[in-house]
Structure formats: structure tokens, C-alpha cells
Amino acid sequence: MTEFRLVLETYANAVRSGWPAADLERAILHDLPRRFHGLPAEAQAGVLATAPSLTHTRWDALIAAMIEHVARLHRHDLPAWIDEPERFLDRTWVLPDIPFMRRNAILYAPAAFIRHGALPDPRDLDARGGERHAWVP
């Protein structure tokens, strides 16, 4: 079995490829942190160091927020690229469509997501760090 190498550009490529929004959310909010948590600290630092190219969509903010979030969880220095202005939204994006889930996202989103303006349902950010097994759309 070959080991998956976590490369953030994979998620930017998924955005550019036109994946459905639900698949992008699942990949960024579940798959990315699961794979990140499974890496040794040195490999995590390597992932953080390489910025994904910009897609010029709101997904750039969500990717940056997720990386900021997992970097803080693992006590890594924050990569400079997450502070690029293009990785912030001028208008807050609340991902869930269901009213009570939107309220939870607004009230309980972690600081990294609030800062970037992309608010997922915080229940998607479980302590396990995403899904237990690799997910392929």
C-alpha cells in the first residue's frame, strides 16, 4: 500500500476542477485535517511551509483557515502565506444552509475560521481530526 503524501495544492486543484461544494467541504474540513494529524511533526511543518496556489474563490479562505486551525492545534508556527489578503473574505461565508447549523457556525466557529471569514459547522471539526479512513470523491 502506498502512503498518501499530503500536498495542499491537491485541495486547490479540486476547487479548480469544479468539484461539487459538498465534496470540497468534506475534503477540506475532514480529509485535510485527518491526513495532517496522521503525519509526524516534521512532515506537518513541511506541509505548512508550502502555500497552495490561489483559486480566487472563497475556498482559498477556508483552506487557509483550516491550516491555521490545525497548525495551532499542533503548536506549529503559523505559515506566512495564511495572512495573504486574498485568503480572507470581505463578507463572511457561513457554510451550513440549515438555520440552527448556521447559528452554531456563527456562535462557535474557532478563531481561525472567524478571522478568515469562512464559518463551517463546528461539529465538522471533531477532536478526531476528520474521518477515520481515506475518502475519495
Each PLM stretch: what is its role?
Residues 74-137:
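Charge-dense, extended regions
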Residues 2-81:
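Charged, helix-prone or intrinsically disordered regulatory segments positioned adjacent to compact structured domains
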